[in-house]
Amino acid sequence: MSKSHTYVLGINAYDHDVAACLLRDGAIAFAIAKERINRHKHSTGFYHDVIDYCLRAEGITLDDVDLVVRNCYVLPVGELERRLTYQDVPEILPPKERKLAPEYPLFRSRSGKVVDISHHVAHAYSAFAVCPFKEGALMVVDGVGSYAADIAEEGHRIDNLSPLARESESYYRFEGSTLEPLKKVWLEPVTGFLADEFFNMNGLGALYSRVSSYIFSDWNKCGEVMGLAPYGRANQFKSLVAFANGSLDVPEWTEAFDQPYLPEDEKWESSPGMQHWQDLAWRVQDDTERVLIERAIWLRETTGAKNLCIAGGVGLNCVANGRIVREAGFDNVWIQPAAGDDGIAIGCAYYGHLAIHNKPRSFVMEHAFLGAPYSDRDVEAAAKKWFVTVKTCHAPDDDITAETARVLAEEKVVGWFQGGSEFGPRALGNRSILADPRKAAMKDLLNARVKHRQAFRPFAPIVLAERAAEVFEGDEDSPFMLLAKRVRPEWKERIPAIVHVDGTARVQTVRREHNERLYRLLLEFEKLTGVPVLLNTSFNIRGEPIVETPADAMKCFLSTGIDYLAMHDLLVGKSRYHRLFYPVMKWGSDVATMIKVGTGTDLSRGEA
């Protein structure tokens, strides 16, 4: 390919959720997280595979890239790579990657076209640079960002601040391509030690991760905490934060919290500590919502902005997001779908495009389908497996959407694999497991046969955008499944499989122009059932990332109780012989999953 385009590459490097994003002339060409390639959730380490994925998809080499912008919240990438040459840091770079890294052109690069930026700046650019607003306010809230010593943002330095202080919250105003910092909240180190665990620090996102670690023995289970919170009793614990006049303090973890989950517990959900955990989840969720709403109101009053953008890992809390939309007073709210650290790659790329190349904003992120597409030949090759039946459907007479809608209406579970994969943690209709939401039993069936998740966790709906206000309260668009909405009373009994215990649902609205095939599937299902809603959950098995390739999809399909797999125009079923071999395949899948998640034989603590 001739060099007729300008390319900028953004990278989230080394720590959790390694990812890359490639811009072509200011528009996102491709983006991918490392976990989708190596099949290990929240993957850390070297970044060559995500870069190679994007370059291969575009048909270019690294020499064609004009600028590379990177971030690692642990240390600036350049400094970290210098240390890796003489320090033993196995959790950062395992032996295989340590051998590979020095051979890669970007490792320890001294090229002028390689730039490092700080963490919250990258989060900020990931949101405002691709939002639909010309101007507005922006909030970044996460567990932890860069060290004060590594930040060069104007207006964000404070005298006498420890160089080991970390970013916790950052607030900005933006207009066009210009980003203006307004306020930053810092985490002061507890011990002054460089490796102090962030979730022991004095911050909002850090506190939420601390509760996640306490309840689930994993700091990265914040979504599970959010799902557990509605089961808790209100105000059984006093507030975990002290928040007044815009000042936030998180008191030390108290001795009252003495019932942490231990991985050797055989039955988590029947544990005597369950009510305690539910009450604590309610408490931290309520505290988080209260602080975020007050911060958002302050930001609106300070800036006079009508539009708000949100990024950072706390931005994945769809319950808090829903309250911000309803209560903070902004006309419009846009949330980066990859609000966590995978989205750092998008922010790095756009920092390069806007701040270094000085280009104007021109791209709006209307969808998150940023993975490379797979060919029909790839799909057909993957489908040539034992114990399956394959039907080829072609529009308009034998459309895959009509055939899939038919089996869904018969209460079958369908794996749905179309187009490029979603970037970010949500399955938004290209790598999804779909089901009929009209019976509450569907939730239990999915958990028993496919997902093996905790029973308290809800499943989400996808809905035709023009019908959403009829089914759910509020008229806000929610294309990225980042808003919790109340299900209208007259619909609760019609779609019980997607209604959470508090009467809400994490809604995704679907428009024809963003996903034609998924939209048509919803139309076909509505024709058959009168319901413009489907249950949507991520296409993966417990402990694994969402499927990326046709081969990944076939593996998940064959080793679970999914009834059909719709890949492109193929509808793949299971032959009668599969029923004979399925118990053995399921046993092998369960064993592999238990090894991967490290929870012994307990199948009650699955991941989405």
Task: Name what the model sees in each region.
Residues 114-117, 270, 274-290, 511, ...:
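Short acidic-aromatic active-site loops that bind/stabilize oxyanions
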Residues 61-73, 304-313, 415:
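Short glycine-rich phosphate-binding loop at a beta-alpha junction
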Residues 36-61:
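N-terminal phosphate-binding loop and adjacent alpha-helix
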Residues 244-275:
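A mobile "lid/hinge" subdomain adjacent to the ATP/sugar-phosphate binding pocket shared
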Residues 57-103, 107-108, 116-117, 125-127:
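Short beta-strand-loop/turn "lid" adjacent to the catalytic site in phosphate-handling enzymes
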Residues 7-8, 15-33, 38-41, 91, ...:
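Flexible beta->alpha loop and helix N-cap segments adjacent to enzyme active/binding sites
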Residues 52-66, 296-304:
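Phosphate/pyrophosphate-binding loops at sites that engage ATP/ADP/AMP, CoA/4′-phosphopantetheine
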Residues 283-308:
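Phosphate/ATP-binding catalytic cores across multiple sugar-kinase/actin-like superfamilies
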